[in-house]
Amino acid sequence: MKEADIHAHIFPEKLAEKASHSIGSFYGVSIEREADMPRLCAEDKLAGITRCVVSNSATNASQVQNANTFLAEAVRGHDGYLAFGTIYPGMDGFEEELDRMLELGLRGIKIHPDFQKLAIDDERGIETYKAIARRDLPVLFHMGDDRYDFSSPERLTNLLRRVPELRAVAAHFGGWRSWPRSLAHLQPEGVLYDT
């Protein structure tokens, strides 16, 4: 049987240790390994994973281009690996960056509202999501951190009412630490979930 992982994070090797530590601190967990491409490939092989989507999330607009270039280069030459790029919703030049992402071969987009400190349904991002939908790119949303109100299931439902053609994937089964809310509110047709 072929196994797939659609939610793996990687960072440039010089940043992987710091990024892994920062993410662990943010969530109050211990991350034992650095999140870089060589380690991911080795561990995927041991686990029998043959397809993998890698991503990371820019925390501000100034990080977007470098992150997308890195992700495209990281998966080049690795059969079975695809990259989802990142965008900061509402950033200047989002149309051009979305086109560049397609030219780079990126296959979707990862949004982390809690790291970006911008609610999924924030008005500033609506035109960005419409542009993403026009390009038929799926968006993997980090979902449901109950410490904040940026990534609630209700907010994704609100966004999909405004941009119903958006292909949304709700990470962490639709609501990291808020699954009951996800089950109650995140019912739009066409939403996919990662588990």
Language model features with spans:
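An N-terminally biased module of ancient metal coordination in phosphate/nucleic-acid-related enzymes
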Residues: 1-62
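A generic "structured core" feature
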Residues: 2-11, 45, 99-101, 128, ...
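Short beta-strand segments
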Residues: 5, 53-56, 86, 169-171, ...
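Flexible loop residues that form catalytic
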Residues: 9, 57, 114, 173-174
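Short, glycine/charged-enriched secondary-structure capping and boundary segments
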Residues: 18-21, 67-69, 97-100, 123-125, ...
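Alpha-helical scaffolding within the catalytic cores
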Residues: 35-41, 66-71, 93-96, 153-156, ...
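Active-site gating/metal-coordination segments in enzymes
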Residues: 50-51, 59-140, 145-147, 192
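Catalytic pocket-lining loop regions of alpha/beta-barrel enzymes
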Residues: 107-108, 121-195
